[in-house]
């Protein structure tokens, strides 16, 4: 084995010289240069500075403007709540521990950090799945006369929390466990060991199947069908310039959504699966650290993709920030009108993300 396994930790370094120490008790500067820990703390601080305001603003603007309190926006708010879970439960903890060079908060802190980071990420992921299903049902109309209402939104919210808890809770109760990973300043699911009594192997297979592959398949199917529906509508109205603009807008939205999902999770999932399927192989602490924290940065660009591209929300946000007046009123109003005209040629509901 090319690492050192101890009680509730695994460090990717063989303890041949006796310098390896518990990540709960001693700085881990023998893994990487102390400057790397400072850089990690600075990056977490940067994510907090961006992630908290944009997600809090999303919640505040939606509550302030009644016209934004639509059933679909319940899901978008859920996405913002998930991102705030990651900011408060994950980023602040990691920033604090990286300043010390080890997981100074102990086992309890590791469990809490791992739980909240996993819960926030999973709520966000399953919220995207619900959004994809809603767009597919409303635009492609596989169910005739379906209208997405408040009850559907509430069921969608409950579904995201149930699925998120189904992934985040088991490591707290003995099915797998949370341990420090990478540079030992943040905690995640144990992909690294076959620790007796924790059934890590079965949990990792379950997590990858039910909480990565299935969501990715659903999102790909729904947005693929949505794109086909837009193309078919555009082909039936070749002379309509507004329809062509609608096709380009939705195509761009779909590409951003799918790419955003893959950029968030594919590197982390790929590295985690590699470590799991090649346990005992040699890898450095940065091998898991970089994709893990790049995935967490989704709390910043999630709201940009799924909410800030909504013209109505953007108008309300600018109005709130500018104390009740939108200096770009004419431009925003024209854009919103054009968007509604474009959308009507494809679906009576909408083809934009909200």
UniProtKB/Swiss-Prot annotation:
The modification N6-(retinylidene)lysine is found at residue 296. PROSITE patterns: G_PROTEIN_RECEP_F1_1, G_PROTEIN_RECEP_F1_2, OPSIN. Residues 333-354 are annotated as: Disordered. Glycans are attached at residues 2, 15, 200. A motif ('Ionic lock' involved in activated form stabilization) lies at residues 134-136. Phosphorylated on some or all of the serine and threonine residues present in the C-terminal region. Residues 1-36, 97-110, 174-202, 275-286 are extracellular. GO terms for cellular component: membrane; photoreceptor disc membrane; plasma membrane. Keywords: Cell projection, Chromophore, Disulfide bond, G-protein coupled receptor, Glycoprotein, Lipoprotein, Membrane, Palmitate, Phosphoprotein, Photoreceptor protein, Receptor, Retinal protein, Sensory transduction, Transducer, Transmembrane, Transmembrane helix, Vision. Disulfide bonds join 110-187. The record marks 113 as: Plays an important role in the conformation switch to the active conformation. It is a multi-pass membrane protein. GO terms for biological process: absorption of visible light; G protein-coupled opsin signaling pathway; visual perception. InterPro entries: GPCR_opsins, GPCR_Rhodpsn, GPCR_Rhodpsn_7TM, Opsin, Retinal_BS, Rhodopsin, Rhodopsin_N. This is Rhodopsin. It comes from Salaria pavo. The lineage of its organism: Eukaryota, Metazoa, Chordata, Craniata, Vertebrata. The gene is rho.
